[in-house]
């Protein structure tokens, strides 16, 4: 199973997918920059218990974050809980997405994940809408090119 974690400014969205890609559960936690890795582990363990799944059955995890102060603790918590580090969406991760922005590092990992997911489901051109703490509209043109938002 795959555990997907999206750390936003207001909430942390957590989803568990089985090997066929079906959603098994989706949950949300408050984003709290003060939490330690141990506290995050307890929160995740409680979610697995709440939804009647075993975290020991998770084979992989992926982390997407727009809250840099939480990145280290979240990575540490996922590594401790699952026994191996998560894939972290960020600079250097090969997505097959061409980004046409002057400063690509200003593009949030959540927006990259949105665009890649949209391209897995639909053919370009595509308009994406991310409704996190801030609402962001993006445009993906032919050739898997993110034009901006």
Question: Which role does the model predict for each range below?
Answer:
Residues 44-60:
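Phosphate/pyrophosphate-binding loops at sites that engage ATP/ADP/AMP, CoA/4′-phosphopantetheine
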Residues 14, 63, 132:
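Residue-level signal for inorganic ion chemistry
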Residues 2-46, 144-149:
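Short glycine-rich, Thr/Ser-proximal phosphate-binding strand/loop in the N-terminal lobe
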Residues 55-66, 85-87:
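Short glycine-rich phosphate-binding loop at a beta-alpha junction
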Residues 2-6, 62, 126-130:
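Short glycine-aspartate micro-motif
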